[in-house]
Amino acid sequence: MENKNHQQENFKSTYQSLVNSARILFVEKGYQAVSIDEISGKALVTKGAFYHHFKNKKQLLSACYKQQLIMIDAYITTKTDLTNGWSALESIFEHYLDYIIDNNKNLIPIQEVMPIIGWNELEKISLEYITGKVNAIVSKLIQENQLKAYDSDVLKNLLNGWFMHIAIHAKNLKELADKKGQFIAIYRGFLLSLKDK
């Protein structure tokens, strides 16, 4: 039993080492410029170990993007009270913006991720984190009749579009930082327009 636990720990450790190493390389050089050999070398594992964990580099990119969202989600979750729908929607956006501005140089650009893993995979991963939280809050506000009678899918797509816009423009860090207050004010105004008074 102890041997099995040790194997599981090694498996997880190797997996995480590959993801961490790949994420660093993808950020530094871009997805296309990084080889599996380079990732394996940085992770201090064999190429065989790479293929034991991942079918290909694309699958590893998905894992890296998921890890990126986990980090963003953890940051937001520790700073946001998710029980109050309206303030949670504001807070999630503000803290997301803060995280992107503060950690911009350590993020894989969404423009590199989406063409490789595809929109469906990107959306599936996103639904586990920020997108899922926003959707759950919108559903709750609809159930509580706090939102105007708009189609729930339209509302969810528009609200999540704000986050996608920030992700797409993350590389324009100076513009994001300089106009942060305007982004927040416009977003709040948009939220207010949705309230069923």
UniProtKB/Swiss-Prot annotation:
Q: Which SUPFAM superfamilies match?
A: Homeodomain-like
Keyword annotations from UniProtKB, A to Z = DNA-binding, Transcription, Transcription regulation, Transposable element
**In this protein, which residues make up the domain named HTH tetR-type?**
12-72
State the Gene Ontology terms under molecular function. DNA binding
Point out the DNA-binding stretch(es): 35-54
Alphabetized InterPro entries for the sequence: DNA-bd_HTH_TetR-type_CS (IPR023772), Homeodomain-like_sf (IPR009057), HTH-type_Tx_Regulator (IPR050624), HTH_TetR (IPR001647)
Q: Report the protein name in the record.
A: Transposon Tn10 TetC protein
What organism does the UniProt record list as the source?
Escherichia coli
The record lists the lineage as:
Bacteria, Pseudomonadati, Pseudomonadota, Gammaproteobacteria, Enterobacterales
